[in-house]
Amino acid sequence: MTRKNRVKFYASAGEKAQVIKPINGDPFIGMLETPVTSAPIVSNFLSNLPAYRTGVSPLLRGVEVGLAHGFFVAGPFIKLGPLRMTDAAEVAGCLSGAGLVLILTACLSIYGATAFQRDDIVGVKTLSGRSVTRDPLQSSEGWASFTSGWLVGGLSGVAWCYILTQVLPYYS
């Protein structure tokens, strides 16, 4: 009798290196570092957004964010609103955009009133003992200033959108 050599292969799944890991190995923090969010180009882009620029006052941050949102929120109301095929489409769309800016301003102020009920007096220090200044936006006064800037910027963005719809010759 001849004996055949048989070889059996078993695949074993070893420890795979994880690309996405929770911060400090604690999955309950709820903030995951991904290759996208931890990439230098993405972190530079995010740090240049108006909400994260710490060198700018909260009022100016709110104006900048409000201008962009007010300008872009009026367009869908003009082109997709119920009065889109009438002569009053621009006026109705811009008034609807202004109404949405007012509603979002109320939402921002409600968020600020609930999120920043108490201001922590405890300062943050680095390992060398140097004091780290807090972002002024992360306080009730800073958030109120941001909300005021948002309102002014948002309504200005809607007004700018209306002016452009009336002035640009190729709009209609």
Language model features with spans:
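Cytosolic juxtamembrane amphipathic/interface segments immediately preceding
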Residues: S43-S57, S131-S140
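Short, charged cytosolic
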Residues: K21-I41
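N-terminal chloroplast transit peptides
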Residues: M1-P22
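Transmembrane alpha-helical segments and their cytosolic interface motifs
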Residues: R53-F71
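Mature, well-folded catalytic/scaffold domains that follow N-terminal targeting or propeptide regions
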Residues: E33-P40, L59-L60, A68, V101, ...
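Hydrophobic, membrane-facing alpha-helical anchors
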Residues: G14-I20, A39-Y52
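Membrane-interacting alpha-helical segments
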Residues: G81-S172
